[in-house]
Every structure is written in C-alpha cells, then in structure tokens.
C-alpha cells in the first residue's frame, strides 16, 4: 500500500482538496463565532478540535507570514532554502500520517480485533491500519513523533505508538465510539482504553474470583445436563463469561450505592443466571425440573421455568443489593421496555432523578437485538421525557447464531442474515459506545464491564457490551445443530471450555496450583448435590421502606362497590385551583373558552362534558395521595382537542400543567406526549404499573385502531401476566372507539380482541357512555383494593354530543354503574323488546326511538362488558315481564365488537320463551367502510333493525 493510494482515497472524500479554502474560511469563522456557522459544520469542527486545554487559532495570519517568508527567500541561498522546505514538508507529512494512523485505529481497529473465540472468522486486513498506507515506511519505526491525543507520552517512537494502538484496538476488545459527537464522552473512552492498556487488569485474588465464577457457570450446566437428560434448559455453555461479567457489574453497582438492579433477559442462560447470579436455591430449581410445584403456584396456569422471574436481596462486597429478574415470554426483546418501566417506577419512588440508585440491565441475543423492532423503540425512549432511566447497560450474548440462522461476527458476502456488520449497529443511533469482547478472555470481559459501568455512571447514557461467544449445544439440548452448521460445530466440539482455558492460564502464571481447578469443580458439584448455593450469599427478601406489599391489592373483588363520589365543596375547590391561570398567561381563544366553560360547569351553570369530568377525576386522586401517569402520542392536548391537561401561552410558548400544581410533590401527576410508538411505550407502562400500585397508569392510543401495534404486550403481559406469573397490574388503556365515517383505520379499538382474552376475571373492559361514568370508572380503578387491567373504549364524537353530558350531583352522589337501565319512564308492561347496547350507538337509538315515538322498546346500556354484570342484567330482564325479545345492538360488524363474545352470556340467563336477536353491520374482514355515504346508510340500517326486531340467533348462542 502506498501514499498514492491514500491520496486517491482523500480525493474521493466529500471534504476534498478543491474545497480546502472554503473549509478553511468556514473554520476561521467558527473560531471567531461558533454560532455563525451551520449546526452540522459546528458539530464537525468541534469533533476535530484538539482536547481541552489546546486552542486553535486562525490560519490566515500564518499563511500571510509564510507568504512573507517566501518573498524573503530571495535573500538567502535558494538551494539551502529549498532543501529546508522539503525537509519540513516531509516531517510535517510524516507527523500528520502518524496522527491519521492513530485515528484510524480508533475508528476501524475493531474490524481487525480477535473477537471470535472459535477463530472461524478471519481477521480482517484493514488497509487503513497499515502504516505504509499512510506513507510511513519501515525506516520510520524508530523515529519519534508527537502522539497527539493518544493517552500516552507526548512523544514516542512510531514502533511504540503502533504497539499501543494495536494492543488497545485490535486485541480481544473491539471498541466503537468515534461516532460520538460529544467530545467529552469520546475523550473519556479514549483515556480509559488507551491509558490502561498495559496495566494489570486484575489482581491474583480477582483472577481467582473470576475462575470461581466460571466454575459455577460451567458446573450448573453440566450438572443439569447429566441429571435431567434431554430436558430443555437453554444452556449458557459457550457464553460462560456472562456470569463473571454480571458479578463484576453487581460489585461495581454496590460500591456506587446502587440499591436495585432490574434485569431483563431471554431464555438463553437464564437458569444459570438465576442460580449463580441471583442466588436462587438449586433445590427449588431441581423441583421445577421434577415437576414439583407449590400449592399456591398451581392455582394459576403457570409458565415454563425459563420464563419465570425472581427477586431477592444479596450481600456483595459487604453491601445489600436487591436484584430482580423480570418475568418474560418467549417473544424475544419484548421484556426490554417492561424492565425500563419497572426501573422508572422504582426511581420515581426514590426520587432518583439521575438513575444513581436503580440500574436497568438488559441481556440480549445477537439475532434478536438486530431483528426485533421493539429494540429500536426501547433505545429511542432512553432519553425521552418521562422515560429516561439514566442509562441502560446492554449485554449481547453474541453466540453468532439464531436457532439455525448464522449471524457470525464476520460473514461471507451474500450470506448475511442482517444488513449491518454487527448486531449492535442499531445502538449507534444513540451514539452509545459499543465494546465487543472475546468471551474466552474473561479478564477482558471484566475490564469492559468496568468500562461500561463507569461510562453509564459518568454520562447516564446507554452502553453496549457485545460478548462474542458461541453456543455449545443446539438451540435447545435436544436439537442437533451440526445439520445446519457443520463447520461451526466441528470447531465447537474441539474448543476447550472457557473455564478450562482460563484455569490453564492461571496455572501457567502460577496464580493457582494445577489441582485447584478440579477442586473448584468438585466443591461446586458437592454443593449442588446438597441443594445448596455456594456461588452467591443471599439474604432472601429483606425489604425496605420502598417494598410493596401486593397482598393489599388483592383484598377486593371486581364487583366490590367503591365510594368514588366527591363532595361538592371539594369538587368546586379543586376546579377553582385547576382553572386559575398564571398571571400574564395568554391562552388560545378556543382553549380559553374551554377553561371558562369548565368554571361554569363547576358552578353548576353548565352541564359537564367529558374533559371536565376526566380532569376532576385526576384532581381528586392526586389530592387523595395517589399518583397519576397519563401518556400517549397526543395526550396533553388530547387527539380530539378536549383535554388540555397542559396549556400553552400563545405569546411566549411557555406551558403550564395545572394538575402538577395541586400537590407539593409534582411527581404525583405526570402527563407526557410520547414518541410515535405503541409496542415500546405500552410495554414501558405495563412495567411501571406492575411496580407501583399506587399510581394510576394510563396509556392512551391516538385512535383505538392503532393498539394492535402493541399486540404482543397485550397478549403476553397485560391479559395473561397474572395467570402465568401472579403479576398484578392496574394499567389502564384508553382506546378512542366509535363508527363515525372515518374509515377502517379510525373507527375501532377492536373490543372483540380484548374480550376474547378475557377469562378468570383477568381484566375489565368498559364502554362508558357519560362523563360521570368516566369520572367514577377512573376513580374506581384506584379506590378499590384491587389491581386489574382496565380497557376502555373511549368516545370521540360523544365528547361534544349534546346528550352525552352529566351534572354535578352525578359526581357528588353516584358511583360507576356497570349497567344503566332505561332512563325514560316507560310502562314496563307495554315493553315488548329490550335492546342492550354499549357506547355511542345508544344515542343513535334513543334519538331514532324518540323520532318514531316508540314506547314498546327499552334501551339498556352495558357499561362493563367484562366481567359481565350478570345480576344487573338479570334484573333488567325481570323488570320487563312481557318483553320476550332480547336484542343486542352494536355498530361494529357481526364478527367484531362484543357480539360473538357476549351472546352466550345474554342467552344463559334467558327463559325458554325469550328470543335472542341481534342488529349489527354484516360481517367484514375490515372494521369499517371508507365511504361516508355508505357508512351513514349502514348506521341507519343497524338502528332501524334494532328497533324493528333484528335477526334471530340461529343454532343457539
């Protein structure tokens, strides 16, 4: 490689020589006034500036000086001057070449690092790392050069400079960080990597500790392999260094005053982590393998052992540390936002705004980290308002394969399973540093763990450790991997274990005797034979002032009455506080009208609308000591311009959230407009709600139709978390729902899907039809000693419907009614048909009935579809003894809405002489038509059919 090739490369750069004068002028302008240049150029110039302490100066005076010197050359010997100039130019070019070489090692050294423990991936020949490529020759090796920002002596021989950068960047650690635009962060990483390269990483005692951790990692796997032959355990073998990695992480955390670590991980290595990191009793684990379960666990459906979570307190470096391993399904990476939400709730409880006391740790697989979209959503939340947890430590157990799909560190062109070179490349969007490390070098693993934890502590930012390893067995222990990866598994069969390699190294170093590895292995195995854990000192669940007693939230039943009323004095006082604006605060005229109307509503001069009732529900809860967390993509204003929880000064742009000023603790009310994510955000809120039962956590969809973007969270956590894991959750979901001619993407919150998931009183599905019902439903969610998910089909056009209003005494005297009977004074004896319905269609029905002057049809609203209010329903049937037709009306298609999930309940409590009928749109593969006139015709037909008798149920219900 020659200097000419480097010149060719430079000439193809976007900053090429032809633009040098332009760039030079821009840089001088930047030095004079940084804000005078474009933001992109400003960021670039800051990135190339020298470290703190060195100051760049404008070059134009220097160029002028050189011009003057050139003119004065005529006064000296032309030959001598030319010789000196050539020498100076060569020296300057050599010095520049050395600095370029250092920089290229920082940028591309990771590509030549020895990361693959199997040695299957050939070490890349990166031309930028060849000194000759930069014009440096063998005769330059002993010449001294300035080292620039290299964390070393100011001047060193080129040979020593190359030795340093090779050791730092191309050994068993590959560091990626040069894309970070914050110079302080970049320099910090450089200093730590380069400044400690030849220092001993571990003392002899620490090396022994690491060996002990590896003995435990290997020991549990071999024990289970021999004792429970053929049973799935998703072994960690090949990635054994994860155990000393986590041990070091916890030691550092405890030394810094961290109180809680919440871990999220998939199935790979989970049992190993449970026993050797969290200290789960091996005896309890063996019982799970043998099918022995406690009586309490058999009261629910349960889950497989490698999905189960665990919580405990451990003692490490003389300090107590609370560890949590989150429950999770097999849907890879979906636990990530759940962990972040749980961590956030713990931090808020401790007023830990920076994230110093609670740390999230996420353990990923390489294939899933690169492939699952929720990874990006969770990363994008990391610095979002209301979602930051002070930085997450991400650990990739990179075994270079996903079930049978290869994801090697280096892949042959045309055989890639992903587009990006590394599975970690998505993290670059955060400018998070990535430390790739060879899993068969445990000391390097411990070093990068310290580096990662220190970076997180210093900058409160996400950091990635890519543990490059392999999978010794198949996807599970019964699988045969050699059928699809014959070359890889031939190499794996010959590969000594990490424990064997490290033990041999320590024996050769004289750190341990040659018999010690076998003694460690035997001691660990003997402990397992006794069902004891010798790898971790556990304290059990000690608890502290932040510990939640969840038994207090299982005392009530779903039908336990709750006093959700509010005294008139309290209501009017809170309303006055809520709608008193700061001085000199100018509202938009439309918002001002809403606030002025709410003052009149509180005085009883206007009927109450939905926005007022909702706001007062939150105000009452905050005053009573509960917290409210209301989030969604347009939540502060409300998708339909009805809420205005945060108001804006139209002159200054300042904003103000009245509910945050009801209590001295502003944490009690949080309202956030979130990034455009359903899955990640809903997962976060689920995690938050399962950790803090005293917070009303509400996620609101922009339109209910978009909730299916988070279907995995709904299916695997919200609907089934209690049945599988015994996890209580009071999460509330607001799904704007209603057929109003807006087409198939803005009509339905898919109530049928939620109702299909309902069983065992696992959650509540409600469709409130009045502001007062909304008020009481919200307050009921917190006032009962019960925590169940609440799914609400919320209104759209009803927010301003002239009939959908309430009055003050509805709030001061009422409670949530699971079913609302006929409101007109009908002669019960004359009623021939009872129409049951839910939601917006009720108002179409009563308007049509009034227009037709029908007195033979009673219209009843079922406000809670699940759990089904059987007693209320039976009372309505009994109230109309001559009504032999019971009809269900819904505006959704027949195969959607509540009909298919509710008809058996409607039928079950009818007498033999009752007919069950229905009136719906005809079945459809989509939710709604896209044409307004067709929609209007369909709606009229549904209402007409309901009042006239509908269709009979054929073949029973």
Feature map (PLM): residue ranges:
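Subset of Sec-pathway N-terminal targeting signals
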Residues: 2, 9-51, 55
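Thiamine diphosphate
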Residues: 2-7, 16, 389-514, 727-730, ...
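Extended, charge-enriched "interface" segments that sit outside catalytic cores
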Residues: 48-242, 258
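Hard-cation-handling environments
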Residues: 498-499, 509, 513-628
């Amino acid at each position: 490689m020659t200097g000419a090739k480097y010149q060719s490369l430079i000439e193809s750069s976007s900053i090429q020589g032809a633009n040098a004068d332009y760039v030079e002028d821009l840089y001088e302008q930047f030095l004079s006034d940084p804000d005078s240049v474009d933001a992109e150029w400003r960021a670039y110039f800051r990135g190339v500036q020298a470290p703190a302490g060195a100051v760049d100066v404008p070059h134009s005076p220097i160029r002028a000086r050189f011009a003057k010197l050139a003119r004065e050359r005529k006064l000296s010997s032309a030959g001598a001057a030319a010789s000196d100039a050539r020498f100076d130019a060569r020296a300057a070019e050599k010095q520049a070449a050395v600095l370029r070489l250092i920089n290229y090692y920082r940028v591309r050294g990771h590509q030549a690092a020895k990361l693959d423990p199997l040695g299957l991936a050939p070490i890349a020949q990166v031309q930028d790392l060849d000194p000759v490529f930069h014009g440096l020759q063998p005769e330059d090796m002993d010449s001294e050069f300035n080292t620039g920002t290299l964390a070393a002596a100011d001047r060193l021989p080129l040979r020593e400079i190359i030795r340093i950068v090779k050791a730092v960047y191309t050994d068993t650690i590959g560091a990626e960080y040069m894309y970070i635009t914050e110079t302080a962060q970049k320099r910090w990483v450089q200093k730590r990597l380069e400044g400690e390269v030849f220092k001993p990483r571990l003392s002899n005692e620490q090396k022994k500790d690491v060996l002990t951790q590896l003995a435990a990692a290997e020991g549990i796997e071999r024990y289970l392999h021999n004792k429970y032959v053929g049973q799935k355990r998703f072994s960690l073998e090949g990635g054994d260094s994860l155990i000393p990695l986590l041990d070091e992480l916890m030691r550092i955390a405890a030394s810094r005053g961290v109180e809680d670590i919440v871990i999220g991980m998939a199935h790979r290595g989970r049992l190993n982590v449970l026993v050797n990191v969290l200290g789960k009793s091996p005896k309890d684990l063996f019982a799970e393998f043998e099918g022995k379960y406690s009586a309490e666990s058999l009261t629910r459906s349960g889950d497989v052992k490698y999905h189960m979570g665990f919580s405990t307190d451990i003692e490490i470096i003389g300090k107590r540390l609370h560890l949590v391993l989150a429950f999770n399904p097999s849907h890879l990476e979906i636990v990530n936002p759940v962990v972040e939400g749980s961590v956030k709730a713990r931090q808020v409880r401790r007023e830990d705004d920076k994230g110093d006391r609670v740390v999230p740790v996420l353990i990923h697989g390489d294939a899933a980290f690169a492939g699952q979209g929720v990874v990006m959503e969770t990363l994008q939340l990391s610095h979002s308002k209301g979602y930051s947890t002070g930085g997450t430590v991400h650990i990739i157990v990179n075994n270079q394969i996903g079930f049978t799909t290869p994801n090697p560190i280096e892949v042959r062109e045309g055989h890639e399973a992903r587009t990006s070179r590394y599975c970690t490349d998505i993290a670059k969007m955060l400018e998070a540093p990535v430390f790739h490390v060879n899993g068969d070098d445990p000391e390097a693993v411990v070093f990068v763990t310290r580096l990662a934890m220190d970076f997180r502590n210093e900058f409160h930012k996400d950091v990635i450790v890519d543990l490059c390893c392999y999978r010794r067995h198949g996807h599970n222990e019964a699988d045969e991997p050699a059928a699809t990866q014959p070359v890889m598994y031939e190499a794996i069969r010959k590969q000594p274990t990490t424990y064997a390699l490290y033990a041999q190294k320590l024996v050769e170093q004289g750190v341990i005797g040659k018999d010690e590895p076998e003694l460690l292995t035997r001691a660990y195995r003997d402990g397992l034979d006794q069902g004891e854990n010798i790898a971790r000192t556990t304290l059990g669940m000690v608890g502290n002032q932040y510990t939640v007693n969840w038994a207090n939230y299982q005392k009530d039943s779903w039908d336990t009455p709750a006093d959700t009323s509010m005294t008139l004095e309290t209501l009017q006082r809170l309303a006055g506080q809520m709608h008193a604006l700061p001085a000199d605060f100018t509202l938009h005229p439309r918002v001002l009208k809403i606030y002025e109307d709410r003052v009149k509503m509180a005085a009883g001069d206007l009927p109450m609308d939905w926005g007022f009732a909702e706001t007062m529900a939150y105000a009452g809860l905050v005053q009573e000591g509960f917290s409210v967390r209301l989030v969604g993509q347009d939540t502060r204003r409300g998708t339909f311009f009805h809420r205005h929880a945060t108001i804006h000064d139209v002159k200054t742009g300042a904003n103000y959230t009245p509910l945050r000023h009801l209590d001295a603790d502003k944490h009690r009310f949080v309202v956030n407009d979130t990034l455009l994510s359903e899955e990640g955000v809903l997962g976060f809120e689920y995690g938050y709600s399962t950790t803090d039962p005293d917070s009303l956590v509400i996620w609101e969809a922009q339109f209910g139709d978009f909730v299916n973007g988070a279907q995995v969270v709904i299916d695997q956590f919200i609907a089934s978390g209690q049945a599988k894991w015994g996890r209580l959750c009071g999460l509330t979901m607001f799904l704007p729902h209603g057929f109003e001619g807006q087409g198939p993407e803005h009509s339905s919150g898919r109530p049928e899907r939620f109702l299909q998931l309902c069983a065992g009183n696992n959650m509540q599905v409600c469709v409130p039809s009045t502001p007062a019902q909304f008020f009481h439903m919200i307050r009921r969610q917190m006032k009962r000693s019960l925590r169940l998910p609440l799914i609400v089909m919320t209104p759209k056009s009803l927010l301003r419907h002239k009939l959908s209003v309430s009055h003050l005494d509805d709030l001061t005297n009422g409670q949530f009614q699971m079913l609302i009977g006929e409101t007109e004074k009908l002669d019960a004896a004359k009623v021939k048909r009872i129409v049951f319905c839910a939601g917006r269609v009720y108002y179409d029905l009563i308007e049509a009935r009034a227009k037709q002057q029908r007195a033979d049809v009673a219209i009843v609203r079922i406000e809670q579809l699940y759990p089904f209010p059987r007693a209320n329903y039976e009372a309505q049937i009994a109230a109309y003894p001559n009504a032999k037709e019971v009809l269900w009306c819904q505006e959704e298609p027949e195969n959607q809405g509540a009909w298919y999930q509710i008809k058996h309940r409607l039928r079950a409590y009818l007498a033999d002489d009752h007919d069950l009928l229905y009136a719906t749109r005809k079945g459809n593969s989509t939710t709604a038509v896209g044409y307004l006139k067709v929609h209007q015709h369909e709606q009229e037909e549904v209402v007409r059919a309901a009042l006239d008798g509908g269709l009979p149920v054929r073949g029973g219900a």
